[in-house]
Design a protein with these regions (language model features):
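A conserved active-site cap/scaffold subdomain adjacent to cofactor or substrate pockets
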Residues: 320-328, 339, 344
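Conserved "HGTGT" condensation-loop signature of ketosynthase/thiolase-family condensing enzymes
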Residues: 1-56, 73-80, 84-212, 216-218, ...
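C-terminal substrate-binding/catalytic lobe of Rossmann-fold NAD(P)-dependent dehydrogenases
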Residues: 354-355
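A basic- and aromatic-enriched beta-loop-alpha substructure that forms the phosphate/nucleotide-
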Residues: 60
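Active-site capping/gating regions of soluble enzymes
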Residues: 347-349
C-alpha cells in the first residue's frame, strides 16, 4: 500500500519516477496493523530508491503534520530538497482475518515485539480507573464543554448529530471514504440497535472508525527542485504557515476542560505565518476523531459549527475513516485537490495527538508566499492542575461520561473530580441509580461524594445537588 500510494503521488505530481529517485527523506507514519523491523528502509528497498534519510515516526494524530513541518524546516536550512511522507493501515483486513480464525504474518517483523511507543506513560490514576480509550477521554471534554455552554444533555447530542451529518454529506461525495453515505442528523444522534451509545454523549456513528484499509502519501519539494523535476505549476500547493502547541498531557490536568488554549496558539501561529486571517480561509479540515476535537478547533478559530465552509474536506474520521496515526496525510492530500480546483484560495488542516494534548495547524495555498514562511513559534508551556490518585469526601464533578456495553446498556460512569483545594482526580461509579441520573441530569458542576476503595475512587451522588440543568 505504501509503495502504491507513493507511486500514485509521484505520477500525480507530473514528475513520475524522477520524483521518487530525488527523495532525500522518507518518513513512514507508525503502523498499528503490525510492526516492522524498519518500515522506512524496507519501503525504500521496495521502491528501489536510496534516500539518505529514512524516518519511522511515533504515534499520534499530529505525526504527519509534524513530519511535513520538519521536512520544510530542513529545506529552509538547505539540508533537503525533496521529501516523502506516507501512511497506511490494513486494520480492517486484520480484524476480518481474526474473525475468520485465519492467521496473518507480517513481512519483516522486528526480532522482538516492541511496546507501543507512547511518549508519556499514563498517569497512575488513569491506569487505576482505566482512563485509556480515546472515546472516553474526548467524551469527557465534550461534557465539560456542554456544561460550560449550559446546553442540555439531549440538546448537545442533537447538535453533534447535525455536526456529523454535515461531515457525512462530504464523505458521500468522497470515493475514498470508508462509509460514503449521507446521514440525517437524527440517524446519527438517536441511539438504536445499529447505533448504540458508546460513551455519552457519543453514539457509534459519532466516533472515529480505525478498522479501515487506507494509505496516503505526500511529496514535498523546494520550489527549485520542483522546477528541476518538471512539476507543472498547476500541480503545486505551497505550505504557507504552521503552528504547533501542547495542552497538558493528562486529561484531568487541563484547567478548563471545555476548551483548548493550545489550539488557539497553534492556529494563530499558522495564520500569522501565512499572513492571513480566519476569514481568508476557504477550505478547512479540522481533526475530527470526536466531537470535542472539532468543537474545540472551531471555538479556537471563532467559527460556528454551521459555517458554510464546513470543517472537513474528507468527510471526517467517523465517515471517511481514521487510519491510526495517518489521517492527516489523507486530509492534506484532499486539501491539495481542493486547492488545485480553487487556485489562490487558502486551506487550513489541523491534527490532534493523544488525548487532546498535541496540536498542529498547517496553512496551504496554490500561491507561494513572498518569502519562505517562518518556523513555528515556540509555544508557552501549558498550565496544569495537580492530579492525585486518591480522592475522599466532597468533590465537584468537572467532567463525566457514561460508558455503554455492546448491548447499549450503561455500565460505568467515569468522572474527573476536583477537591476543594483545587486538585484533580478520577472516580468511577456503577450504581444503577447513578447511571440513570447521569442520563437525565447534568452532573458536571455538581457536588458528589467519593471514597477510596482498593485503589479506585468510588463516586456516589444522592441527587440532592440537582440545580436547574437537565435534558
Amino acid at each position: 500500500m505504501w509503495a502504491e500510494v507513493l507511486g500514485a503521488a509521484a505520477a500525480d505530481s507530473g514528475a513520475g519516477r524522477a520524483a521518487l529517485e530525488a527523495v532525500g527523506s522518507l518518513a513512514v507514519v507508525y503502523c498499528q496493523t503490525w510492526q516492522y523491523d524498519d518500515a522506512a528502509t524496507r519501503l525504500a528497498q521496495r521502491l528501489g530508491v536510496q534516500p539518505p534519510c529514512t524516518v519511522n515516526t511515533g504515534i499520534g494524530g499530529t505525526v504527519p503534520a509534524v513530519a511535513v513541518v520538519e521536512a520544510s524546516e530542513a529545506m529552509r536550512r538547505g539540508e533537503l530538497e525533496v521529501a516523502a511522507v506516507v501512511s497506511g493501515e490494513a486494520l480492517a483486513t486484520r480484524r476480518a482475518r481474526k474473525r475468520r480464525g485465519e492467521p496473518y504474518r507480517a513481512s519483516f517483523p522486528p526480532p522482538e515485539r516492541r511496546p507501543f511507543p507512547f511518549e508519556a506513560p499514563f498517569h497512575p490514576a488513569e491506569v487505576a480507573h482505566e482512563v485509556f480509550q480515546a472515546y472516553l477521554t474526548f467524551a469527557l471534554f465534550d461534557t465539560a464543554r456542554r456544561a460550560h455552554l449550559g446546553v442540555g444533555l439531549d440538546g448537545y447530542r442533537v447538535g453533534l448529530g447535525r455536526l456529523w451529518a454535515r461531515a457525512a454529506r462530504v464523505a458521500a461525495a468522497n470515493p475514498d471514504a470508508w462509509f460514503p453515505e449521507a446521514r440525517r442528523p437524527e440517524d446519527i444522534a438517536t441511539p438504536g440497535p445499529d447505533n448504540r451509545m458508546v460513551a455519552s454523549p457519543y453514539t457509534k456513528r459519532m466516533v472515529a472508525i480505525m478498522d479501515v484499509d487506507m494509505a496516503a502519501a505526500l511529496l514535498l519539494a523546494t520550489h527549485r527542485a520542483a522546477d528541476r523535476l518538471g512539476v507543472p505549476p498547476e500541480r503545486r500547493v505551497y505550505l504557507r504557515g504552521a503552528g504547533l502547541a501542547l495542552d497538558p498531557t493528562y486529561v484531568a490536568e487541563h484547567p478548563a476542560m471545555w476548551r483548548s488554549p493550545a489550539m488557539r496558539v497553534a492556529a494563530g501561529g499558522a495564520l500569522r505565518a501565512a499572513g492571513i486571517g480566519v476569514d481568508d480561509l476557504a477550505h478547512l479540515d479540522l481533526y475530527s476523531c470526536f466531537g470535542s476535537s472539532v468543537y474545540f478547533a472551531l471555538d479556537a478559530l471563532g467559527i460556528g459549527p454551521d459555517d458554510p465552509r464546513g470543517f472537513t474536506v474528507t468527510g471526517g474520521l467517523p465517515s471517511h475513516g481514521g487510519p491510526g496515526s495517518g489521517y492527516v496525510t489523507h486530509a492534506l492530500a484532499w486539501m491539495a485537490r481542493r486547492l488545485r480546483e480553487d487556485p489562490g484560495a487558502h486551506g487550513l488542516v489541523s491534527g490532534v495527538g493523544m488525548h487532546m494534548t498535541k496540536h498542529a495547524f498547517t496553512c496551504w495555498s496554490t500561491d507561494p508566499a513572498p518569502v519562505a514562511p517562518p518556523p513555528p513559534a515556540a509555544a508557552p508551556a501549558p498550565e496544569t492542575r495537580p492530579v492525585v490518585e486518591r480522592l475522599e469526601g466532597t468533590v465537584t464533578v468537572v467532567a463525566a461520561t457514561v460508558l455503554h456495553g455492546r448491548d447499549g446498556d450503561p455500565e460505568r460512569l467515569v468522572a474527573v473530580c476536583e477537591t476543594p483545594e483545587g486538585a484533580r482526580g478520577y472516580a468511577v461509579g456503577t450504581d444503577a441509580e447513578l447511571l440513570a441520573a447521569a442520563g437525565e441530569v447534568e452532573l458536571v458542576g455538581r457536588r458528589a461524594q467519593v471514597r477510596p476503595d482498593g485503589g479506585v475512587n468510588r463516586l456516589s451522588w444522592d441527587g440532592g445537588d440537582r440545580g436547574s440543568a437537565g435534558r
